[in-house]
Amino acid sequence: MLTKFLPLLLLLLPGCALCNSDGSQSLHMLQISYFQDNHHVRHQGNASLGKLLTHTLEGPSQNVTILQLQPWQDPESWERTESGLQIYLTQFESLVKLVYRERKENVFFPLTVSCSLGCELPEEEEEGSEPHVFFDVAVNGSAFVSFRPKTAVWVSGSQEPSKAANFTLKQLNAYNRTRYELQEFLQDTCVEFLENHITTQNMKGSQTGRSYTSLVLGILMGCFIIAGVAVGIFMCTSGRRC
């Protein structure tokens, strides 16, 4: 089952190896959903603050384990965040199964959808440089679509986009939620968290917890955007060139 899933994860993870030597200078998030068929799906993901792994997500449907590896949220707050992530995963799977029932002749398994997003602050000596923010989506290991934060526009990951990619881009670029809210999350929420974390990284207490809580809520918003990407994929031959 995982012969295609795990190699893809390993291909995406080196992005974290490019994090700046200062562990607080970048935040990377990764989610991968592997659909063996209409009944079996396995999720895996993580969040890293520089070289520090902060969150992990792994497991088959109905038994996904989500962990925060750093004590930035109190138990009650983390329980709400974890519940939100579990709800998202359930809705994501339901969406795929719904489209499969409606377009069964166009859906081909296995299928792997991966999402990588985050932000990086420039080195201090790079005067005038702006933070680097990104949101990239791949299907079966190939670049599918990516987000241009400056213009809040989604673009194809290929010079010759398929009909599936064009359909997906049309959907993602049609709504404020998938454009300007994402732009705000990447350019403001994510970057401000890193800047605040650098200022308070030697301090312990609720300040960091509150900051990270708002970031996790932003991650949830990003996760729902992945569901929008899935709609485009499954509505047009499941990501195959068409």
Curated annotation (Swiss-Prot):
The record's section on PANTHER family has: ENDOTHELIAL PROTEIN C RECEPTOR (PTHR15349:SF0)
Protein name per its UniProtKB record: Endothelial protein C receptor
Q: Which UniProt keywords apply?
A: Blood coagulation, Disulfide bond, Glycoprotein, Hemostasis, Membrane, Receptor, Signal, Transmembrane, Transmembrane helix
Q: Which residues lie on this side of the membrane: Cytoplasmic?
A: 236-242
As given in the record, the signal peptide range reads: 1-17
Gene that produces this protein: Procr
Provide the glycosylation site positions. 46, 63, 140, 166, 176
Example GO biological process: negative regulation of coagulation
What is the stated purpose of this protein?
A: Binds activated protein C. Enhances protein C activation by the thrombin-thrombomodulin complex; plays a role in the protein C pathway controlling blood coagulation.
* Organism (species): Mus musculus
Q: In which tissues is it expressed?
A: Expressed in endothelial cells.
* Membrane topology note: Single-pass type I membrane protein
Q: Which residues cross the membrane?
A: 215-235
Q: What is its main location?
A: membrane
Q: Which GO terms describe its cellular component?
A: centrosome; membrane
* One MF term in the entry's GO annotations: signaling receptor activity
Q: Where in the cell is it found?
A: Membrane
Stretches of the chain found on the membrane's Extracellular side:
18-214
Which residues are connected by disulfide bridges in this protein? 119-190, 223-236
Give the Pfam families listed for this entry. MHC_I_3 (PF16497)
**InterPro entries cross-referenced by the UniProt entry:** Endothetial_C_recpt, MHC_I-like_Ag-recog, MHC_I-like_Ag-recog_sf, MHC_I/II-like_Ag-recog
